[in-house]
Structure formats: C-alpha cells, structure tokens
C-alpha cells in the first residue's frame, strides 16, 4: 500500500505529485523553478535574520 503525497507548487499553487514523476518538485515545471530562482537572485526573497553583527561581518579582504 503506497500513499501518494502531493504538495502545492510554491510559485503557482498547482498540485504536484511528490515522486519520480515530478522532476522539478516541489515546483510543477521548470518555468516555476526558474521564476523562484529569479526571485532569490533579485533578493525579493531572503532568509530572515536577527540583524546582529557577527565577528565575520568585521572581516575585510584588505589587510590592515
């Protein structure tokens, strides 16, 4: 007994079967996958942060 898992495409909301029949999962198509990638590249999407500076923020490629 195998239960079919479905998810919604994050870009368009279309139902997508989670399995080998959907090579672009969780996206429904290559188009939706590229739209999402473009949103990340344009910084329309980002992972939230606390905004606190860490030690690495003070690093510079220039040596003092």
Curated annotation (Swiss-Prot):
Q: How is the cofactor bound?
A: Binds 1 zinc ion.
Which residues are noted in the entry as Zn(2+)-binding?
9, 12, 28, 32
Q: What are the disulphide bonds in this sequence?
A: none
Q: Which Gene3D superfamilies match?
A: Erythroid Transcription Factor GATA-1, subunit A (3.30.50.10)
* UniProt xrefs under InterPro entries: DNA_gyrase_inhibitor_YacG, Znf_NHR/GATA
Recorded hits in Pfam families, A to Z, give:
YacG (PF03884)
What does this protein's UniProt record list under function?
Answer: Inhibits all the catalytic activities of DNA gyrase by preventing its interaction with DNA. Acts by binding directly to the C-terminal domain of GyrB, which probably disrupts DNA binding by the gyrase.
Family named by the database record: Belongs to the DNA gyrase inhibitor YacG family.
Quote the subunit structure annotation. Interacts with GyrB.
Against NCBIfam families, the record matches this protein to:
PRK00418.1
The protein depicted here goes by the name DNA gyrase inhibitor YacG
Question: Which taxonomic lineage does the organism of this UniProt entry have?
Answer: Bacteria, Pseudomonadati, Pseudomonadota, Gammaproteobacteria, Enterobacterales
Q: Gene encoding this polypeptide?
A: yacG
């Amino acid at each position: 007994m195998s239960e079919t898992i479905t998810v919604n495409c994050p870009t368009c909301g279309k139902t997508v079967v989670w399995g080998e029949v959907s090579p672009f999962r969780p996206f429904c198509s290559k188009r939706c996958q590229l739209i999402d990638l473009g949103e990340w590249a344009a910084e329309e999407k980002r992972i939230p942060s606390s905004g606190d500076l860490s030690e690495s923020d003070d690093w510079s490629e220039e040596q003092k």
